[in-house]
Amino acid sequence: MKKETEKMDQKNFSKPLSLAKVQVTDAFWKKEMELVRTEVIPYQWNALNDNVPGAAPSFCMRNYRRAGEVEKERKAKGDKFVQIKYPLDTFETLPKDGKMDGRFYGFLFQDTDFTKWVEAVAYSLTQHPDPELEKTADEAIEAVCAAQREDGYLDTYYLINDQDMIFTNLKDNHELYCFGHLTEGAVAYYQR
């Protein structure tokens, strides 16, 4: 079945095109998109899960899972929930002597690595449906959603380390930056 496509209106550039109806035909870009689909997206998924031998761990998906545990405990205990608090004074937190505790690890903006990955997955799935990749993305999204608070807040740096400090340092700690990438990834995945 031939895919329905749209062409850009040469006189009305502000009319948006649905990605599902755009077909890239240029040989250079098709090759690059195929490279992203077959090599970059799988590699990045492994990197997000700290499964790339020799590469520094990102702790990204570990942080989402950890934030999900904190949120589950907060919901279960309600008003009796007391968060273990960790310092918020570092740009990057690494395990000491290889030993990890319950704190956030990685760069304080690490959440964006996942949200940019899911955005790339969305664009890839729009052009090339892949049930296995979609299943991986859906499962990862479920883990991320488990970390989200009931009020919609989602930034693992604060959810794990100290929820009382949410939105107290917008200048330095990348909360709005992370939110922007989360929004872009969510919209792309929803619209595909």
Predicted regions and their residues:
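Glycan-recognition and catalytic cores of secretory/periplasmic carbohydrate-active enzymes
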Residues: K2-R192
